[in-house]
From Swiss-Prot:
Protein's recorded name: Maltose/maltodextrin transport system permease protein MalF
Record gene name: malF
Lipid bilayer topology: Multi-pass membrane protein
Organism of origin: Salmonella typhimurium (strain LT2 / SGSC1412 / ATCC 700720)
Function description: Part of the ABC transporter complex MalEFGK involved in maltose/maltodextrin import. Probably responsible for the translocation of the substrate across the membrane.
Entry's transmembrane regions: 17-36, 40-57, 70-92, 284-306, 319-341, 370-392, 413-435, 484-506
GO MF terms, alphabetically ordered: ABC-type maltose transporter activity
Localization per Swiss-Prot or TrEMBL: Cell inner membrane
Length: 514
């Protein structure tokens, strides 16, 4: 006898396909909206991920993929997609001065205007809940008055000549300032059909478009007569000389263009970028290597000590030594920043009392780097200590008993037995720690902000800057503008360098993953 399983209403196929259909419509709407807004990469990414997700969760044959899809989607969205965007930006001139599309930059220039013709003093006079606009010609003394109107939106006011201004009290400067946005949307039309708009808090004046666009793309300044053409190599409207060559003047804002590998070329050819880049790269490698070596050394030694059988109160020592790992790193970094203060820090007070010295932790390059390594070692050793404590449990006690019979001491046991047996399983974690510290942005940003600064560079760079913080400063702290394209190029190089170093380290260790 066949048993018929009763389905609940939420298990029905109609409900499932209805939900899938609604999700599909919502995704389609979002994709179209992104496409209309010009966000093509986001539209493509959303379409791919959502289509794959709907197919996998709607098809019974792809049931196993339902467990894999969230991880793959997360990796694609948060790893691959930003990587592709960064590499794409690296081949453009995208910056704080070249953010717009060509059409948008052209429209911004065409919207600019300049004062032309007469200037009129204006006043606002209340008429109940409405206002009247009055203009006065300073040269002839003639007055012009509008009908009553209310603020709101763009509007044209037809003004008529009048012998005298209204008798009410004229609006003061505070009221005009409060309604400035509304007044900027008013166009006053005089009896001779000339138009004037608000040019200051007390004046209306005639305006003309600053630029005129020809059919061939030539832009002419109506005030100075200078002509401009779009230069697709630099991403600006640039002046042209009488012989047709490019002039020196560029119109801002610029627009984004593809410039090929120029950003990468700048890194290796521009001395103002090249010198700090290679110096910062060397320091980044040294910092990462020293951090890994010191954290492993300190963590391993402390792990051996707290595992020592003769030591009393081991649990208390373990808790105390792991505490730096429990405190959020940004809090510890800011505390150390205060402790290392050159004038009032406790560390300098102690060194001055004991040895009569006050190191310049934040102004001298060498001591600043030493401080960074000290703080990072403090932050990183608890992690390595926890790992070593676990790995020490896997070492057989028979090895130490045999070495004791041969007369070996603690140091011989450590270097002949403990270290060789711990270093191999630690190697992948050491490589991961190296990669993490290679991009340890939080430490540098909060502790030194990259300082002390280097002199004679065209980009902001400091002696404690890592490549990642150097990239950040180029992108967001550049005095000559935020150069996102150059920062993206350096970020791409960092990705390649970290990947190459990780591969070299793995091959150098000749590890076998069985």
């Amino acid at each position: 006898m066949d048993v018929i399983k009763k389905k609940h209403w939420w298990q029905s196929d109609q409900l499932k396909w209805s939900v899938i259909g609604l999700l599909g419509l919502l995704v389609g709407y979002l994709v179209v909206l992104m496409y209309v807004q010009g966000e093509y990469l986001f539209a493509i990414m959303t379409l791919i991920l959502s289509s794959a997700g709907l197919y996998i969760f709607a098809n019974r044959k792809t049931y196993a993929w339902r467990y894999v899809y969230p991880g793959l989607a997360g990796m694609g969205l948060f790893v691959l997609f930003p990587l592709v965007c960064t590499i794409a930006i690296a081949f453009t001139n995208y910056s704080s001065t070249n953010q717009l599309t060509f059409e948008r930059a052209q429209q911004v220039l065409m919207d600019r205007s300049y004062q032309a013709g007469k200037t009129y003093n204006f006043g606002l006079y209340p008429t109940g809940d409405e206002w009247q606009l009055a203009l006065t010609d300073g040269e002839t003394g003639k007055h012009y008055l509008s009908d009553a109107f209310s603020f709101g939106g763009e509007q044209k006011l037809q003004l008529k000549e009048t012998d005298a201004l209204p008798g009410g009290e004229r609006a003061n400067l505070r009221i005009i300032t409060q309604n400035r946005l509304a007044l900027n949307q008013i166009t006053a039309v005089l009896p001779d059909e000339s138009k004037v708009i608000m040019s200051s808090l007390r004046q209306f004046s005639g305006t003309r478009p600053l630029y005129t666009l020809a059919d061939d793309g030539l832009l002419t300044n109506n005030q100075s007569g200078v002509k401009y053409r779009p230069n697709n190599d630099s991403g600006y409207y640039q002046s042209i000389n009488a012989d047709g060559s490019w002039g020196d003047e560029k119109l801002s804002p610029g627009y984004t263009v593809t410039i090929g590998a120029k950003n990468f070329t700048r890194v290796f050819t521009d001395e103002g970028i090249q010198k700090p880049f290679f110096a910062i790269f060397v320091w980044t490698v040294v910092f990462s290597v020293l951090t890994v070596v010191l954290t492993v050394a300190v963590g391993m030694v402390l792990a051996c000590l707290v595992q020592w059988e003769a030591l009393k109160g081991k649990a208390i020592y373990r808790v105390l030594l792991i505490l730096p790992y429990a405190v959020p790193s940004f809090i510890s970094i800011l505390i150390f920043k205060g402790l290392f203060n050159q004038s009032f820090g406790e560390i300098n007070m102690m060194l001055s009392a004991l040895f009569g010295i006050k190191p310049a932790w934040f102004s001298d390059p060498n001591t600043a780097r030493a401080m960074v390594i000290i703080v990072n070692t403090w932050l990183g050793y608890p992690y390595m200590m926890i790992l070593c404590m676990g790995l020490l449990k896997a070492i057989p006690d028979d090895l130490y008993e045999a070495s004791a019979m041969d007369g070996a001491g603690p140091f011989q046991n450590f270097f002949k037995i403990t270290l060789p047996l711990l270093i191999k399983p630690l190697t992948p974690l050491m490589i991961a720690s190296f990669a993490f510290n290679f991009n340890n942005f939080v430490l540098i940003q909060l502790l030194t902000n990259g300082g002390p600064d280097r002199l004679g560079t065209t980009t902001p760079a400091g002696y404690t800057d890592l490549l990642v913080s150097y990239t950040y400063r180029i992108a967001f702290e550049g005095g000559g503008g935020q150069d996102f394209g150059l920062a993206a190029a350096i970020a791409t190089l960092i990705f390649l360098l970290v990947g190459a170093l990780a591969i070299v380290n793995l091959k150098a260790t000749r590890m076998k993953f069985d």
